[in-house]
């Protein structure tokens, strides 16, 4: 009898130990935008399974949830979004799922309010914080903590991945500053389709002017086109930039208006603003997006693109492998 009881207890202990040591399934993460989803993948590694809602060319200001998106949210363990009304039309859906499961607005959780750019519109805050790499890197420790709370067995992995990735972001931040500094001072003006580069301009010392407002929901009128054409002509701006998520017609309208005033200006290239590029392309990661943007800006405005720092050599090698 005693032997039977001993065997039973031993079996229960072994089963309990096996359950405790059994690996947890990957944390199912849904991120609204690529600039969050990519960082979630870098921090989470094999301990997370990330789905990004809005792909290349997606406009978070105008995006509305489909029935498929609602199913994706329902299947998630946790939901990550930018906050500050970037995904304005998803607000009701995010609020509803926030009552059901961990839902994190990464920007308000990670970035001090005094670091924000305030604007005089119904949003009150410029939500494009990822344009300042040093500022956006603050979401990394937030994600480390958030993921560790839900998968404590992977906490060490999250910490190591987060620290390594943040070193890359620090190197990228310095490289962008050095790159922009090579542009002649009188040409250091960035004209874009909409006003998404305010944090970029503040962080890297380049004047930024958007044809459209902070949100693509705002309309561009004839007065806006004329005002911008006057600025471009008076400042002798060498190039304007289109954006991957916005129809280029407003930029082309400004170019036409500038030419009517007897001046010439061209398109300096396409920039990634509210979405990253296709996977496997130069802008298909967060680091790649900012690297591609900076390379195009510097080249078009008369600067010289410096070599990448050693801390980004691993990223550059992985990009070449993906091509």
Locations of the language-model features?
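Bacterial N-terminal signal peptides
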Residues: 4-15
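Extracytoplasmic metal-acquisition and chelation regions
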Residues: 20-323
């Amino acid at each position: 009898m005693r032997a039977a009881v001993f065997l039973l207890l031993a079996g229960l202990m072994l089963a309990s130990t096996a359950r405790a040591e059994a690996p947890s399934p990957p944390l199912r993460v849904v991120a609204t935008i690529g600039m969050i989803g990519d960082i979630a993948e870098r921090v989470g590694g094999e301990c997370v399974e990330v789905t990004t809602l809005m792909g290349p060319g997606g406009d978070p200001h105008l995006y509305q949830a489909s029935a498929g998106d609602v199913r994706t949210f329902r299947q998630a363990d946790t939901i990550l979004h930018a906050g500050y009304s970037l995904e304005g039309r998803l607000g009701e859906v995010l609020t509803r799922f926030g009552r059901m499961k961990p839902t994190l607005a990464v920007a308000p959780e990670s970035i001090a309010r005094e670091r924000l750019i305030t604007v005089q519109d119904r949003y009150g805050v410029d939500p494009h914080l990822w344009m300042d790499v040093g500022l956006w890197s603050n979401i990394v420790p937030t994600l480390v903590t958030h993921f560790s709370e839900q998968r404590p067995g992977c906490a060490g992995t999250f910490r190591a991945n987060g620290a390594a990735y943040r070193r890359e972001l620090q190197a990228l931040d310095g490289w962008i500053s050095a790159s922009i500094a090579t542009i002649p001072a009188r040409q250091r003006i960035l004209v874009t389709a909409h006003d998404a580069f305010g944090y970029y301009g503040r962080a890297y010392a380049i004047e930024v002017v958007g044809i459209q407002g902070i949100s693509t929901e705002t309309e561009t009128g004839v007065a806006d086109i004329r005002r911008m054409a006057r600025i471009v002509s008076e400042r002798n701006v060498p190039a304007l930039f289109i954006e991957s998520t916005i129809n280029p017609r407003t930029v082309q309208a400004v170019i036409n208006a500038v030419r009517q005033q007897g001046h010439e200006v061209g398109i300096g290239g396409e920039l990634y603003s509210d979405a990253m590029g296709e996977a496997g392309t130069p802008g298909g990661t967060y680091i790649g997006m900012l690297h591609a943007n900076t390379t195009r800006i510097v080249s078009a405005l008369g600067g010289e693109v410096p070599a990448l720092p050693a801390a980004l050599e691993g990223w550059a090698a992985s990009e070449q492998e993906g091509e």
